[in-house]
Amino acid sequence: MSIDSLPPLREVIERHDLMPKKSLGQNFLFDLNLTSKIARQAGDLRDQPVIEVGPGPGGLTRALLAQGAYVTAIERDDRCLEALAEIAAHYPGRLRIIAGDALEQDFTALFPEGPKPRIVANLPYNVGTQLLLNWLLVEPWPPFYSSMTLMFQREVAERIVAKPDSDHYGRLGVLAGWRTQAKIAFDVPPQAFTPPPKVMSSVVHIVPRETPLPCRAEALGQITQAAFGQRRKMLRQSLKSIGGGALLEKTGIDGTRRAETLSVEEFVALANACLP
């Protein structure tokens, strides 16, 4: 079934009264060329499983299905479920709809066997960063997914790919750099969305590292949270609440440095120093 055989998205939204909700961080994409570009960025999707979070009325969903994917769409806005069901009827057996909150979803249970899914989503802005953190810190590793192609606000995208000694470098950049290889694929202007956000958006493509530096995710999460929670302070101060003095001494890292100057490898060393 061709994507062109489905009714236009604007018609679907009017028929189901699907005005985007600010409380859910919704910004809908209508441009079929753009949704197809996002789907292509995820690679060859023919007969491949894909997880989509926050599909809304299904603009990106249509593009993923048109590229041959088997899509599992997770949507917490009940208003959108009927519109998604109409798409599912056009693609029998290729669209599974889960009504619920992605933050509460056990993703590892969705695909107990077969190839690992790719995550492709225009993430709701109000939960996108937390979802990414959950996926970066998931255990066991390698993770349940094979890649992620995600839309974020440009500022968040820059934090994901940031390197030490840069303005955007922080906890997100350390965790992403530790376990994955991430790149900004392309930018999306505000006018591509309804309603248009006030900022530029970017699509980020993320591929897990098979063998990241050995480290406990929980410990690295704790270290980075403390270090960047007071990022303007010296490490001996920002890490004080978690025994930073001993950690710095054990690793030989200068306590007068600030968090944004440390490499991913140095953060891993601090996390490993937490071990008894």
UniProtKB/Swiss-Prot annotation:
Keywords: Cytoplasm, Methyltransferase, RNA-binding, rRNA processing, S-adenosyl-L-methionine, Transferase. SUPFAM superfamilies: S-adenosyl-L-methionine-dependent methyltransferases. S-adenosyl-L-methionine binds at residues 27, 29, 54, 75, 101, 122. Its EC number is 2.1.1.182. The keyword S-adenosyl-L-methionine applies. GO terms for molecular function: 16S rRNA (adenine(1518)-N(6)/adenine(1519)-N(6))-dimethyltransferase activity; RNA binding. The keyword rRNA processing applies. It catalyses: adenosine(1518)/adenosine(1519) in 16S rRNA + 4 S-adenosyl-L-methionine = N(6)-dimethyladenosine(1518)/N(6)-dimethyladenosine(1519) in 16S rRNA + 4 S-adenosyl-L-homocysteine + 4 H(+). Pfam families: RrnaAD (PF00398). It is found in: Cytoplasm. InterPro entries: KsgA/Erm, rRNA_Ade_diMease-like_C, rRNA_Ade_Mease_Trfase_CS, rRNA_Ade_methylase_Trfase_N, rRNA_adenine_dimethylase, SAM-dependent_MTases_sf. GO terms for cellular component: cytosol. It is an enzyme of class 2 (transferase). Belongs to the class I-like SAM-binding methyltransferase superfamily. rRNA adenine N(6)-methyltransferase family. RsmA subfamily. Specifically dimethylates two adjacent adenosines (A1518 and A1519) in the loop of a conserved hairpin near the 3'-end of 16S rRNA in the 30S particle. May play a critical role in biogenesis of 30S subunits. This is Ribosomal RNA small subunit methyltransferase A.
